[in-house]
Amino acid sequence: MVRVGAAAAVLVLAAAAAAMAAEPPTDDGAVRVAAGLTKCVSGCGSKVTSCLLGCYGGGGGAAAAATAMPFCVIGCTSDVLSCATGCSTSL
């Protein structure tokens, strides 16, 4: 399960890196960042972080929580992929 959580974190970091890639310099030499995409991806990162923390912190150590946690992490991964896809298609 740690691999799934790590994979979700890597996806968020890759999306954030792509979002923070600077556009080419403008006529005045200034470099501007695509703010809309950055805000969208940052929002996705916040959502997946709180989702994953909820998966790991909400169980209280019960056996049922250990069984449910993999499904929770998969749900978080699915949510972040949907969110990131929404960011790329909304621009």
UniProtKB/Swiss-Prot annotation:
The keyword Signal applies. Residues 1-21 form the signal peptide. Keywords: Developmental protein, Signal. Required for tapetum and pollen development. This is Anther-specific protein RTS. It comes from Oryza sativa subsp. japonica. The lineage of its organism: Eukaryota, Viridiplantae, Streptophyta, Embryophyta, Tracheophyta.
